[in-house]
């Protein structure tokens, strides 16, 4: 019997708060909100690259975020910070932190709290597919918000910065780059505006507050995101996820997630695909949890979970 896990679950059942989970090498800080209602599974909200779990707690313009919205719907909500992000300890070798190492820490959290819905965004997408294959008993469903697909779907790019720089822009990759892994990657405000805060739905008056929330990123993670040298996070067989409820949600103003790309990811994984304009929801970019209709999209996700009996 896993006495440590049972003790953790008993402690978590008492009150909202925070705790640390993850692996010994890569601990993660986790916020916990809400209390479970009968029959409703907990949900784990995982941020993407350059962000922390704070993007789910409040919006840049100060409104309640997705975490409280899901808590109000009657679920326990767990919001981790990736290793080296936010309040999770940063190791000296942070620049070489890999997708697999982050995924292993998230997997440990899921093992501690029991089966849960895993909601992922952007660069945490490949981690979700990997975790679901490695530890299927811990993942009851996956919601991917503009998620990265498994590296199985990406071309293998050369492990050479000059060669990568000569490649044409690929809509499935954005503008590929190969970065040196000797220091963390600092994301410039120009990139944030062009790719994360570009939509008409983003609260532009709060851009400076959003900019201050962005954190340095692992250089290795960036190289894996572009599948440099074929080192992106892959799954063994999409059939291993065939019985898992998966929802992929994408907006029409996300420059790095055009409809064709995320629809292809959904087909490969056997997922349901929601192109928001087909639901009468237009103008969303890469950060719908921050945008002015964030509550509307959270409600769409809640409705899908309830329709699935999760």
Predicted regions and their residues:
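Catalytic histidine-centered segment of alpha/beta-hydrolase-like enzymes
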Residues: 279-294
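Conserved acidic catalytic loop of the alpha/beta-hydrolase fold
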Residues: 100-117
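N-terminal cap/lid segment of alpha/beta-hydrolase-fold proteins
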Residues: 2-37
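Alpha/beta-hydrolase
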Residues: 159-261, 271-275
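Conserved hydrolase catalytic core segment
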Residues: 115-156
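Active-site glycine-rich loops that stabilize anionic/oxyanionic intermediates
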Residues: 47-60, 122-123, 252-253
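Conserved alpha/beta-hydrolase
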Residues: 61-90
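Glycine-rich "HGGG/HGxG" loop immediately N-terminal to the catalytic nucleophile
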Residues: 54, 80-96, 282-283
